[in-house]
Amino acid sequence: PERLAELNRITTPYIRAASLAAIRAQSACPVVLYDAPTLFEAGADDFCDAVIAVLAPHDTRVSRIIERDHLPEEAARARIDAQPPDSFYRAKCGYIIENNGDLDTLYRDTDALYQILMK
């Protein structure tokens, strides 16, 4: 944990600056999506107009990681357990997409949120 904290202390300012430059380069776009696993830890949420979390049940996430990344179950669970709990995202994010169905449902929910954000 100490070495990771030191690595984050060194790299976060550079990652933040590069991310902000990339976002600003898209200023003509009506929406810019910024996928950042450490958004809040890096303080990058302060340059976001809206923050969206996409959440799924724990077991669903485990099986998706195993299938996508070909990891053993223990590694998939460890990856999830290293992340903040869903309650953290529910408290911090303005919008939540519940990704507990099929892709059609996810697309429908994402499009509905897009329509809200574009108003």
Give the positions of each predicted feature.
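ATP-dependent small-molecule kinase phosphotransfer cores
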Residues: 1-30
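Residue-level recognition of specific faces of alpha-helices
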Residues: 3-6, 35-36, 50-53, 64, ...
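Small-molecule kinase domains that catalyze NTP-dependent phosphoryl transfer to phosphate-bearing small molecules
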Residues: 15-19, 28, 46-47, 67, ...
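Switch II (G3) loop of P-loop NTPases
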Residues: 30-41
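Conserved nucleotide-binding/hydrolysis micro-motifs of P-loop NTPases
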Residues: 39, 57-60, 102-103
